[in-house]
Amino acid sequence: MNKIIGIAFFTVSFSVGATVSAAGQAAQIDPLGYTISTPHPIDPAAGTTNPSALATQRQNPYLGSVPSGKATDEVIALSLPQAIALGLRYNLGLIESNQSSADGRAQRLRALSALLPELSLEGRQGVADQSLKEFGLRLPSIAGFPGLPATSGSFGFQDSRISMTQSIYNSLLRNRYQAERKAEQASALSAADARDVVVYAVGASYLQVVAAVARVETARAQLASARELDQQTEDRVSAQLSPEIDSLRAQVQKHTVEQQVTNASNDLEKAKLTLARITGLPIDQKFTATDAAEYREVTGLTEKSAIGHAREFRADMRSAAASVREAEYRLRSEKGQRLPALSFRADYGGAGVNVGAFSQVYTVGGQVSLPLYTGGRIRADIDQAQSNLTRRQAEYEDLEGRIVYDVRVAWLDMQASDSSVKVAESNRALADRALTQSQDRYLNGVANYLEVLRAEEAVTEAAENYIRSLYSFNVAKMALARAMGSAESEIQDFFGGK
């Protein structure tokens, strides 16, 4: 359940970050430009550890990791598969899930031990002086005989035995063991589901880095264009072909784009830091993302087949089913308290005043116990187990609906983003053509600089729309792979072997 809450926090926090980022970009862009409405994907950079790193770690451990190794001066090349492999090894959320699975295994072994024979070796050595009156020993009165003494007198003894106890039939212990088996199975499946969450988290963060790289490259290309146009405008003003205000506008535009390059570079470095935190890379390690963002359609898959695949392979679904079975066995276990319990005990060894005078001794016995009155304790235990079973059944039924919801939402986002990518790519080409024509018109004295400035803003918006749409599309594919319950295997198919 904690893991589900962590996933929800992960998605919501990233979504808010992407919305704020998109809003900030829109404030700098002409609303009449080439704006395309696209679904807002998650933004890993929004998963900050401020103001409390510990609070964030507890709420969503998938944003953290156990750093591996030491940073080097070398700039390493990091591909998407390599980043995912690091995340699957060092991500904090997966480490915690694996440890929970180990805890479940320990609980099962503890429950099993109660059903197995227990052997122990016991030894005693002591000196005693027993009261004969305490045992009720007395002799009839005989004239001239003083009778038995009050105590036996001091004597030593030694006793050494090996003993065995075995539960022959105990409904509580048997069903408790079955419950722990199912709990271990549910924990292992939960750890398997955590792997999909890590793949999704690392993939989305990696794509954020790739998108940030594209924004930096776009901003640098726009800066080169702005500098060239600034020089051309300055030459036209010097030749008295354009008013001085055109040169001033060109300089303002150049400085604006320079700041955009700075901001884009800053966002790139923060995205890299976020990826390093999720994957376990040393925070000071420099790296470059080698896999560029590409548009690749998902083929051979329908929404219906994706839902069927999710119902069959989602590990959290199977974990929830195992939790229901666990709750059923726990209910049987509590009801078993009302049944007789049969156990066996035996011991064998030697006893005497010393080792040389040992005599063979042994004890064999059985025990049957049946509670007659417990003050309502058993009834309370049964009610609590029944309540837990009802809760687990409700969670399982809810998860069935949530799985369909996850797949359909991811599918809708992928379709919408797919359309956005195609429109954005077309608009980007049109905006580039419009800018070229505006520059030609300006240099030929047919148009003023404002037309060129508007065309540059349109190119900027079209480029940003394409980057955002492509990022949304790829993250939607990541979300679909995670929703289907096979993120590790589907990533290769969805991203062309990357």
Over which residues does each language-model region extend?
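Acidic, low-complexity, intrinsically disordered peripheral segments
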Residues: 2-13, 20-48, 129, 465-498
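Periplasmic alpha-helical coiled-coil/stalk elements that build and connect Gram-negative outer-membrane
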Residues: 3, 195-309, 413, 458-459
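Bacterial Sec-pathway N-terminal export signals of envelope proteins
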Residues: 23-124, 130-131, 289-324, 371-372, ...
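Small/polar-residue-enriched beta-strand and adjacent coil segments characteristic
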Residues: 76-79, 118-194, 309, 313-399, ...
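ATP/adenylate-binding site constellation spanning eukaryotic-like Ser/Thr protein kinases
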Residues: 80, 116, 199, 280, ...
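Amphipathic alpha-helical coiled-coil scaffold segments and their short linker/junction regions
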Residues: 87-88, 140-148, 242, 246-253, ...
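Amphipathic alpha-helical coiled-coil segments
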Residues: 96-111, 194, 198-217, 228, ...
